Swiss-Prot record:
<feature type="compositionally biased region" description="Polar residues">
    <location>
        <begin position="7"/>
        <end position="19"/>
    </location>
</feature>
<dbReference type="GO" id="GO:0003735">
    <property type="term" value="F:structural constituent of ribosome"/>
</dbReference>
<feature type="region of interest" description="Disordered">
    <location>
        <begin position="1"/>
        <end position="22"/>
    </location>
</feature>
<dbReference type="GO" id="GO:0022625">
    <property type="term" value="C:cytosolic large ribosomal subunit"/>
</dbReference>
<dbReference type="InterPro" id="IPR001684">
    <property type="entry name" value="Ribosomal_bL27"/>
</dbReference>
<dbReference type="GO" id="GO:0006412">
    <property type="term" value="P:translation"/>
</dbReference>
<keyword id="KW-0689">Ribosomal protein</keyword>
<comment type="similarity">
    <text>Belongs to the bacterial ribosomal protein bL27 family.</text>
</comment>
<protein>
    <recommendedName>
        <fullName>Large ribosomal subunit protein bL27</fullName>
    </recommendedName>
</protein>
<dbReference type="Pfam" id="PF01016">
    <property type="entry name" value="Ribosomal_L27"/>
</dbReference>
<keyword id="KW-0687">Ribonucleoprotein</keyword>
């Protein structure tokens, strides 16, 4: 085995693809059923009304409606989707 690197050899050049995590839909926006709301690692944001948690902690909408981010207790957050008809009636 040579103790010196040969000319032009490089031990770098590997990289992984980005994960594209974060909030995909913000509060007040309208979504359709199945829309991804948040991509995350662990439950940084919890699932609220009409929102389900995927096996990779992705939060997605179950119904068509308007997104609302709310507090869950003192130090947690949750995201809910309220049907658009109910949202207009309360406004």
């Amino acid at each position: 085995m040579a103790h010196k690197k040969g000319q032009g050899s490089s031990r770098n050049g590997r990289d992984s693809n980005p994960q594209y995590r974060g909030v995909k839909v913000y509060g007040g926006e309208t979504v359709s059923a199945g829309s991804i709301l948040v991509r995350q690692v662990g439950t940084v944001i919890h699932a609220g009304a009409n929102v389900k948690l995927g096996r990779d902690f992705t939060l997605y909408s179950v119904v068509d409606g308007v997104v609302k981010y709310e507090r869950l207790g003192r130090d947690r957050k949750k995201v809910s989707v309220y049907p658009a008809a109910a949202e207009q009636a309360s406004a």
